[in-house]
């Protein structure tokens, strides 16, 4: 019954609807709607098609060469090789005129819009040759520039931020050096402390938790310190080590500064090799980037001493780039067939490189002047297996260590080469003399290490068997062959570390942790022979007054820390630091005083001795007074704590007696104590009476 009633009611409603009037939804005449389409249908209008749809991934390349049809394929090959480095190109159009000659521009479509943006960023203003520099834009830029408003609006004035003094560390009146100590507190979390090496105890300047993920590195002049992070690297400076600049390069593993601190090079891995980016330090702008096939050796770029040029070695060539444009010098590489290595002079725009033996042509060491590309000296070498180039820091000498062989053995396919009867030569180039004469020193024993005296005319070598080697010192003088001045026999050292000021040298065995301090002007006497078990690093301070040896947790996990010595080997500080990883002295910029002024100061140095000694005495007296005050304060604190505990113990006596059966046990054994007086000799003095 209920169902039937419902059906009847439904039918009645249907019949009534046939006679109802339709509602009117039209606006009355003169009605004005105050609601805009954007307010009413904003979500739908955002999805409406636009004129730029489908062309976000298209770039326009202008200023390409205008070539005939015969040369078009070669042009396409060159341009496609450049632009395919930034993504997959799905379509390319080169408009041509009636004669089939290109019009000087092209359209390229990438698979993704982000790839097109990257290509514009990297290749705009790219110099193809002397007459053609690309102008690369997104296709959508035309619409952007068409819609520029006619009324100019002034830019918002940004508040000027006063930057801290980046060179405050060299303004210290007592010229104390600074150093940083890094310790790992967790995985990918390194704490870095900055200290000033004042006497009698170093002073802590700043400590930063989680300052870097791996390690830190100072810039060559000590202005900046660089830290490593997942997104890239950052540089810090100033009195409180504020962030100066950051450089986005994910996965950066290594960085290097240009000598004058104008540029920074970052090395980061890619799926197929490495990406290297050169940055402008002051602006943070990317100047140029390179993609290296395979895992290239770190530090593949070499800078000139004045930051005017940077070079890298290619296959049978050297690529030299000018700054700040970073275009190739004269727009072309220097072709050098068989080149194996090169190095810049530390003081002049001179490149030294060596070429291997080829088809009965001897190996060759060449000095080339840049930017003239003029060869100023050549030296032919025979039976050469390898060469190493060692410049003296002052640029006065170049030593080429030549590994030579008596016999060469090859297999049938020349795939495996063995050198027999090895011996070694040192070719010494006198850079400051006319026509650059070359002297030769032959060593028949295995060479384990080589080191120039930074300021002076001596070099040292470790030669012989690794477990029982000899250390020889040679002196280089004008017009005569380098002479052996001293040989220290049966020394188990592996590395040589000269003082930055010369004269003193540390002979180190970084396997056993033993060190010997030698004065090269006093008959090469060993002044001290300390040891630091498992030490893996040696660091001289910039002034040559202190030496630090360190045991890093990168090598071992126990007994990590560092020791500090004087230049004569006297220990002055031992520091045990858990998870210690790194110790670095802060470099100093070169002095602004002329050589004449420096000579004058050295000549009259005795005049300053009295003032220096008085200042040292006052400092030590002040330090002693501070130490006594500190000890007195500690004693007072302890006595206050002790008296408080004694009073508390006395107040609990009644409770103590009750708990012990009403027996006073505090003085139970006092009567059984025996007192014994013991005398022993402390000091004996003998006085002669006349």
From Swiss-Prot:
Family annotation (Pfam families): eIF2A, RRM_1
Coiled-coil intervals: 595-645
Transmembrane segments: none
Bias type Basic and acidic residues, positions: 1-11
Domain RRM: from-to ranges: 57-141
GO process annotations (BP): follicle cell of egg chamber development; formation of cytoplasmic translation initiation complex; regulation of translational initiation
Any GO CC annotation of this UniProt entry: eukaryotic translation initiation factor 3 complex
Gene3D superfamilies for this protein: 3.30.70.330, YVTN repeat-like/Quinoprotein amine dehydrogenase
Compartments, record wording: Cytoplasm
Highest rank taxon of the organism: Eukaryota
Residues annotated as signal peptide: none
Region spans: Disordered: 1-36
UniProt-recorded Gene Ontology molecular function terms: RNA binding; translation initiation factor activity; translation initiation factor binding
UniProt feature, compositional bias: Acidic residues: 15-25
WD repeats: 207-246, 293-331, 334-369, 442-484, 530-575
Keywords: Coiled coil, Cytoplasm, Initiation factor, Protein biosynthesis, Repeat, RNA-binding, WD repeat
InterPro entries xref list: EIF3B, eIF3B_RRM, Nucleotide-bd_a/b_plait_sf, RBD_domain_sf, RRM_dom, TIF_beta_prop-like, WD40/YVTN_repeat-like_dom_sf
Function statement: RNA-binding component of the eukaryotic translation initiation factor 3 (eIF-3) complex, which is involved in protein synthesis of a specialized repertoire of mRNAs and, together with other initiation factors, stimulates binding of mRNA and methionyl-tRNAi to the 40S ribosome. The eIF-3 complex specifically targets and initiates translation of a subset of mRNAs involved in cell proliferation.
Subunit structure: Component of the eukaryotic translation initiation factor 3 (eIF-3) complex. The eIF-3 complex interacts with pix. Interacts with mxt.
Entry similarity comment: Belongs to the eIF-3 subunit B family.
The name this protein goes by in its record: Eukaryotic translation initiation factor 3 subunit B
Organism lineage: Eukaryota, Metazoa, Ecdysozoa, Arthropoda, Hexapoda
UniProt gene name: eIF3b
């Amino acid at each position: 019954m209920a169902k039937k009633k419902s059906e009847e009611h439904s039918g009645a409603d249907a019949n009534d609807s046939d006679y109802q009037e339709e509602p009117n939804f039209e606006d009355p005449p003169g009605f004005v709607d105050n609601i805009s389409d954007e307010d009413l249908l904003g979500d739908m209008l955002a999805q409406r098609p636009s004129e730029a749809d489908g062309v976000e991934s298209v770039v326009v390349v202008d200023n390409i060469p205008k070539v005939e049809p015969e040369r078009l394929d070669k042009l396409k090959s060159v341009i496609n090789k450049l632009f395919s480095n930034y993504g997959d190109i799905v379509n390319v159009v080169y408009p041509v005129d009636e004669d089939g000659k290109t019009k000087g521009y092209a359209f390229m479509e990438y698979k993704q819009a982000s790839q097109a943006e990257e290509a514009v960023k990297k290749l705009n203003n790219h110099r193809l040759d002397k007459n053609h520099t690309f102008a690369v834009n997104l296709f959508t830029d035309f619409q952007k520039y068409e819609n520029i408003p006619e009324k100019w609006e002034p830019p918002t004035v940004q508040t000027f931020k006063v930057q801290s003094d980046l060179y405050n560390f060299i303004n210290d009146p007592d010229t104390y050096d600074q150093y940083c100590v890094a310790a790992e507190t967790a995985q990918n979390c390194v704490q870095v402390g900055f200290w000033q090496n004042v006497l009698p105890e170093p002073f802590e300047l700043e400590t930063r938790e989680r300052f870097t993920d791996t390690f830190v590195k100072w810039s060559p002049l000590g202005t900046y310190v660089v830290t490593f992070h997942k997104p890239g690297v950052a540089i810090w400076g100033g009195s409180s080590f504020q962030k100066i600049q950051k450089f986005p390069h994910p996965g950066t593993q290594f960085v290097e500064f240009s000598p004058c601190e104008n540029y920074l090079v970052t090395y980061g891995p890619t799926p197929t090799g490495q990406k290297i980016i050169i940055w402008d330090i002051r602006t943070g702008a990317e100047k140029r980037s390179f993609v290296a096939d395979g895992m290239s050796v770190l530090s593949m770029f070499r800078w000139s001493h004045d930051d005017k040029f940077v070079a890298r070695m290619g296959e049978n060539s050297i690529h030299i780039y000018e700054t700040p444009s970073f275009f190739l010098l004269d727009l072309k590489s220097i072709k050098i067939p068989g080149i194996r290595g090169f190095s810049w002079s530390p003081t002049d725009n001179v490149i030294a490189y060596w070429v291997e033996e080829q088809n009965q042509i001897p190996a060759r060491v060449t000095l080339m002047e840049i930017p003239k590309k003029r060869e100023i000296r050549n030296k032919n070498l025979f039976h050469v297996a390898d060469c190493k180039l060692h410049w003296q820091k002052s640029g006065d000498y170049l030593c080429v260590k030549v590994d030579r062989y008596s016999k060469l053995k090859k297999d049938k396919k020349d795939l495996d080469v063995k050198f027999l009867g090895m011996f070694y030569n040192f070719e010494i180039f006198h850079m400051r003399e006319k026509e650059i004469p070359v002297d030769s020193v032959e060593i028949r024993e295995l060479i384990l290490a080589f080191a120039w005296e930074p300021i002076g005319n001596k070099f040292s070598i470790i030669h012989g068997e690794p477990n029982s080697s000899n250390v020889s010192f040679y002196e280089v003088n004008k017009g005569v062959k380098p002479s052996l001045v001293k040989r220290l026999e049966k020394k188990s050292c592996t590395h040589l570390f000269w003082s930055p000021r010369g004269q003193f040298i540390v002979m180190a065995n970084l396997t056993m942790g033993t060190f010997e301090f030698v004065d090269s002007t006093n008959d090469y006497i060993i002044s001290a022979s300390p040891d630091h078990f498992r030490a893996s690093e040696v660091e001289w301070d910039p002034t040559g007054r202190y030496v630090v040896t360190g045991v890093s947790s990168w090598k071992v996990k126990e007994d990590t820390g560092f020791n500090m010595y004087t230049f004569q080997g006297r220990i002055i500080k031992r520091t045990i630091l858990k998870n210690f990883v790194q110790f670095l002295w802060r470099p100093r910029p070169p002095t602004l005083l002329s050589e004449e002024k420096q000579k004058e100061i050295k000549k009259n140095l005795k005049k300053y001795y009295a003032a220096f000694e008085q200042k040292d005495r006052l400092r030590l007296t002040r330090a002693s007074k501070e130490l006594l005050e500190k000890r007195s304060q500690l004693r007072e604190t302890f006595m206050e704590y002790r008296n408080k505990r004694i009073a508390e113990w006395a107040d609990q006596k009644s409770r103590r007696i009750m708990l012990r059966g009403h027996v006073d046990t505090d003085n139970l054994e006092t009567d059984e104590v025996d007192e014994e007086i013991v005398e022993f000799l402390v000091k004996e003095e003998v006085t002669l009476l006349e």
